[in-house]
């Protein structure tokens, strides 16, 4: 069994949000003919997507070809829209979540849903989380690596974490809103360097901000193998202990204490990196994630995990399925 925690999906179409809300910055979908569309933002192409980004039947066909049993579906992070007026973001979130729920309902043995929330308005976010879990049946939510000027340790977000614990709602943290201009404007650096940096910042913020201390039952998984965090934990812990005046202001516990308190996906593209990741984060805390259907994703889902001579069959099963089931609070028999 293979359960992919990290995949993205969009509706086939959605309303003209600039006309609906009366201001720019929204992502629009421009169909280019059968099987291809452009995601447009402020008149510029953000990304060209293929039919597998919106058509569940195409996805299932490709899943069958690659041996993937289940995909956890989440929106493309540029759709988060945390910058917008909260009521407008809420309306978009409800549209995206309803579309996601309809897809899961059609194929409940192949898909599970990770919803999206208007995180810039925690009260509204909690209400939509309640709806996602209780009405739509989602086991989790995808959130960004920061919410405008809030890092993930900001007390404004604590009501969301309280609700997530109460509802047993898992959080999948995805980097977004990287610096795109200046020195980062070339070589695809926002995706190659900016995303790992965003994820590392999110992990450090939650650790040093005491989030895992305050919310010990919170289930969090970070995308892209936790960014640079597994490789730089030594530097982070050393800096914490050498400069507690800067690093221990909100939490006095060594960062290493929280290894094992959160999950990452497995998307590191390299056997040495995957070995390090499981050594640092734990073999019980790494989950197969591919970033399907995008080019930076793992093109052969689970192949790297299966190729690892250091992993026994029990470990491989944990990484490809068991850890995802634990993180999402689901039973294997639902998908067998």
Swiss-Prot record:
Q: In which tissues is it expressed?
A: Liver and kidney. Very low levels detected in brain.
Enzyme type, top EC level: lyase
Question: How does pH influence this protein's activity?
Answer: Optimum pH is 6.
Report the SUPFAM superfamilies cross-referenced here.
Answer: Metallo-dependent hydrolases
Keywords in alphabetical order: Decarboxylase, Lyase, Metal-binding, Zinc
For this protein, the parts annotated as crossing the membrane are none
What are the temperature characteristics of this protein's activity?
Answer: Optimum temperature is 40 degrees Celsius.
Name of one Pfam family that matches: Amidohydro_2
What is the catalytic activity of this protein? 2-amino-3-carboxymuconate 6-semialdehyde + H(+) = 2-aminomuconate 6-semialdehyde + CO2
Q: Does the keyword Magnesium apply?
A: no
The record's listing under InterPro entries reads:
ACMSD (IPR032465), Amidohydro-rel (IPR006680), Metal_Hydrolase (IPR032466)
Q: Which GO terms describe its cellular component?
A: cytoplasm; cytosol
One GO-annotated biological process of the protein: negative regulation of quinolinate biosynthetic process
The pathway where this protein functions is: Secondary metabolite metabolism; quinolate metabolism
- What's an example of a GO molecular-function annotation for this chain? zinc ion binding
Note the Gene3D superfamilies from the entry.
Metal-dependent hydrolases
Top-rank taxon: Eukaryota
* Record EC number: 4.1.1.45
The record's family statement is: Belongs to the metallo-dependent hydrolases superfamily. ACMSD family.
What the protein does comes down to: Converts alpha-amino-beta-carboxymuconate-epsilon-semialdehyde (ACMS) to alpha-aminomuconate semialdehyde (AMS). ACMS can be converted non-enzymatically to quinolate (QA), a key precursor of NAD, and a potent endogenous excitotoxin of neuronal cells which is implicated in the pathogenesis of various neurodegenerative disorders. In the presence of ACMSD, ACMS is converted to AMS, a benign catabolite. ACMSD ultimately controls the metabolic fate of tryptophan catabolism along the kynurenine pathway.
Q: Report the PANTHER family cross-referenced here.
A: 2-AMINO-3-CARBOXYLMUCONATE-6-SEMIALDEHYDE DECARBOXYLASE, 2-AMINO-3-CARBOXYMUCONATE-6-SEMIALDEHYDE DECARBOXYLASE
Q: Assembly and interactions? A: Monomer.
Tell me what this protein is called. Answer: 2-amino-3-carboxymuconate-6-semialdehyde decarboxylase
Gene for this chain: Acmsd
């Amino acid at each position: 069994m293979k359960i992919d925690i990290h995949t993205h999906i969009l509706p086939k179409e959605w309303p003209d949000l600039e006309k609906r809300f009366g201001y720019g910055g929204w992502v629009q979908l421009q169909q280019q003919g059968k099987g291809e569309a452009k995601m447009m933002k402020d008149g510029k192409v953000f990304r060209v997507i293929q039919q597998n980004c919106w058509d569940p039947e195409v996805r299932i066909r490709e899943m069958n070809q690659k041996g993937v049993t289940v995909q956890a579906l989440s929106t493309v992070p540029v759709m988060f829209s945390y910058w917008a007026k909260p009521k407008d973001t809420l309306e978009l979130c409800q549209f995206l979540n309803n579309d996601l729920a309809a897809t899961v309902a059609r194929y409940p043995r192949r898909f599970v849903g990770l919803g999206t929330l208007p995180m810039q308005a925690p009260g509204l976010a909690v209400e939509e989380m309640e709806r996602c879990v209780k009405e739509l049946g989602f086991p989790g939510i995808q959130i960004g690596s920061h919410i405008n000027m809030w890092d993930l340790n900001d007390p404004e977000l604590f009501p969301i974490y309280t609700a997530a614990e109460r509802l047993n709602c898992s959080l999948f943290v995805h980097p977004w809103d990287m610096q795109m201009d200046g020195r980062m404007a070339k070589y695809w650096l926002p995706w190659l360097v900016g995303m790992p940096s965003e994820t590392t910042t999110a992990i450090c913020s939650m650790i040093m901000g005491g989030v895992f201390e305050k919310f010990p039952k919170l289930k969090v998984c970070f995308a892209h193998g936790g960014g640079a965090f597994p490789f730089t934990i030594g530097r982070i812990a050393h800096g914490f202990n050498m400069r507690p005046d800067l690093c221990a202001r909100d939490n006095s516990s060594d960062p290493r204490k929280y290894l094992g308190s959160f999950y990452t996906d497995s998307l590191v593209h390299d056997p040495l990196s995957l070995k390090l990741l499981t050594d640092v984060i734990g073999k019980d805390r790494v989950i197969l994630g591919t970033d399907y259907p995008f080019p930076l994703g793992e093109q052969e889902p689970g192949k790297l995990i299966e190729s690892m001579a250091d992993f026994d069959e029990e470990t491989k099963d944990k990484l490809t399925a068991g850890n995802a089931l634990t993180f999402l609070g689901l039973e294997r028999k639902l998908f067998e």
